[in-house]
């Protein structure tokens, strides 16, 4: 075990004194028969800017450390061999290159000020996909010259975290520099897993930057939130996305040279318009578009069709978005379970916001099912809450459960039609909205109001047999008006009518 004056060598795992650690490491570097694997960057100096995947334990958790910047003589060769996705290559290298989130990283941004004052402590970054959470965390590490470790809650165990904590404490002891741990999808950790960060954060031994797309109030421990201020990253504007895409085109032009196709402004405008502020999705769509254009000229319509067919893009703000949710709603209304599941899957697998679908199902429960099955509204409301608490991808079955129940439920639009009749009546009869309320059903909280006749003559229904009384509730000016279950002529579907005729 390594004590206060001892540390474990990251190469051979041998425990040596702090005074002997550097000579001990030098012996490994000079030994030509040493390990063939790269030495951990644990003890290296402040010359790291990019990220290298490595393992921190035998569990092989996906952890990223900062790696050395290549020398100028090798830079050109590295660029040609760079096979990272465009979304990764286009990440900004400094806060000045960062696009969007002016309130956080602009000239007077709160996070920029904290960095400049060297007071950047643990925090939670909350924002939708593609708003720049990971990029911001990496820039904080580079700007503060901190050791940076990137992990994901989907693939990291508690044992991995404990190993990282141990290494971080040793690193702090040796260098005096803290480690920034970027925990992506922090909401995927359960509350017990989140608790292991509390002592490390509280003592300031590590800086935790957690990223989440879910509401921290529902998904994170209150103890963790109290120690990590929450910063909200707003959805990128269309102009923000255009700026990012234009910069990416320049990078691709430098990389591809003469083989870089011409990307028309209309393509940039289209991608930035339909990706709904998701920079990662926009860059992926741009990369795919460039790949298609390199094979030959294509029109904007061809690009649109290929992107949608490939599921690289789901139009969350345009026609596809509204057409799909409309088809889903109508399939539920028509009690077609298969179509309901199809359109639900099409939306979720293409990146639709699950809460948007859940909200629509709450509406369906009242609009299309209503009093035919009053249990559907509580079910839909519970589904919305469950999706908030669980998040994707686990929430997919929860949404499917509710969707199938709604499709199979009996249908009634009596409430929907009745309230529409009220709205139409008030719109066409402006005076009806100011009609005098009958005195006997008015509120009479004071003696003066009672003396004026408020509440006088009111018959309290529970005091009467079966609650039946002769009593008027509507204002005199609209007495006798009917809204509920107005007579309506129901049509018979011609195809069903013909089918009945054919079977006779």
From Swiss-Prot:
UniProt: ATP binding residues: 129-135
Cellular compartment(s): Nucleus
Entries under Gene3D superfamilies matching the protein: 1.10.8.60, 1.20.272.10, DNA polymerase III clamp loader subunits, C-terminal domain, P-loop containing nucleotide triphosphate hydrolases
GO molecular function ontology, one term from the record: single-stranded DNA helicase activity
GO biological process terms on file: DNA synthesis involved in DNA repair; DNA-templated DNA replication; Okazaki fragment processing involved in mitotic DNA replication; UV-damage excision repair
Compositionally biased tracts (Basic and acidic residues): 79-90
Protein's UniProt keywords contain Manganese: no
Entry-linked CDD domains: AAA, HLD_clamp_RarA
InterPro entries: AAA+_ATPase (IPR003593), AAA_assoc_2 (IPR032423), AAA_ATPase_RarA/MGS1/WRNIP1 (IPR051314), ATPase_AAA_core (IPR003959), DNA_pol3_clamp-load_cplx_C (IPR008921), MgsA_C (IPR021886), P-loop_NTPase (IPR027417), Rad18_UBZ4 (IPR006642)
Binding sites annotated in the UniProt record for Zn(2+): 9, 12, 24, 28
UniProt similarity note: Belongs to the AAA ATPase family. RarA/MGS1/WRNIP1 subfamily.
Name of the protein this chain belongs to: ATPase WRNIP1 homolog C26H5.02c
Organism of derivation: Schizosaccharomyces pombe (strain 972 / ATCC 24843) (Fission yeast)
């Amino acid at each position: 075990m390594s004590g206060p004056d001892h540390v474990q060598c990251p190469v051979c795992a041998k425990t040596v004194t702090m005074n002997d650690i550097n000579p001990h490491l030098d012996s490994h570097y000079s030994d030509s028969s040493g390990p063939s694997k790269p030495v951990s960057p644990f003890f290296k100096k402040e010359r790291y800017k990019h990220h290298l995947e490595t393992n921190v334990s035998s569990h092989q958790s996906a952890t990223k450390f900062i790696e050395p910047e290549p020398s100028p003589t090798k830079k050109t060769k590295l660029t040609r061999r760079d096979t990272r996705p465009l979304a990764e290559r286009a990440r900004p290298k400094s806060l000045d290159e960062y696009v969007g989130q002016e309130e956080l990283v602009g000239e007077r941004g709160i996070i920029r000020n904290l960095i400049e004052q060297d007071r950047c402590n643990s925090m939670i970054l909350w924002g939708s996909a593609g708003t720049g959470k990971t990029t911001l965390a990496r820039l904080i590490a580079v700007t503060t010259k901190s050791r940076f470790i990137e992990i994901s809650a989907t693939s990291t165990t508690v044992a991995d975290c404990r190993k990282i904590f141990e290494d971080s404490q040793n690193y702090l002891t040796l260098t005096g520099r803290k480690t920034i741990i970027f925990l992506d999808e922090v909401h995927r950790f359960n509350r017990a897993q989140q608790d292991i960060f509390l002592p490390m954060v509280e003592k300031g031994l590590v800086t935790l930057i957690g990223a989440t797309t879910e509401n921290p109030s529902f998904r994170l421990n209150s103890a963790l939130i109290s120690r990590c201020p929450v910063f909200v990253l707003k959805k990128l504007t269309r102009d923000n996305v255009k700026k990012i895409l234009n910069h990416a085109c320049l990078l691709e032009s430098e990389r591809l040279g003469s083989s870089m196709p011409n990307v028309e402004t209309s393509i940039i405008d289209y991608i930035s318009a339909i990706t709904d502020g998701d920079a990662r999705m926009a860059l992926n769509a741009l990369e795919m578009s460039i790949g298609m254009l390199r094979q030959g000229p294509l029109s904007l319509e061809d690009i649109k069709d290929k992107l949608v067919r490939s599921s690289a893009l789901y139009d969350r703000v345009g026609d596809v978005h509204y057409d799909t949710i409309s088809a889903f709603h109508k399939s539920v209304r028509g009690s077609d379970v298969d179509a309901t599941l199809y359109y639900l899957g099409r939306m979720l697998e293409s990146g639709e916001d699950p809460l948007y679908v859940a909200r629509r199902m709450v509406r369906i429960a009242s609009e299309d099912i209503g009093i035919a099955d009053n249990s559907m509204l509580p079910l839909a409301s519970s589904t919305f809450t469950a999706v908030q608490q669980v998040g994707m991808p686990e929430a997919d079955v929860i949404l499917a459960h509710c969707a199938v129940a709604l499709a199979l439920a009996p249908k009634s639009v009596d409430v929907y039609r009745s309230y529409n009749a009220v709205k139409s009546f008030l719109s066409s009869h402006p005076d009806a909205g100011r009609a005098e309320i009958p005195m006997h059903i008015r509120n009479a909280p004071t003696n003066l109001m009672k003396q004026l006749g408020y509440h006088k003559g009111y018959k309290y229904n529970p005091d009467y047999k079966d609650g039946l009384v002769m009593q008027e509730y509507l204002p005199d000016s609209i007495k006798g008006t009917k809204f509920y279950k107005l007579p309506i002529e129901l049509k018979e579907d011609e195809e069903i009518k013909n089918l009945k005729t054919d079977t006779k």
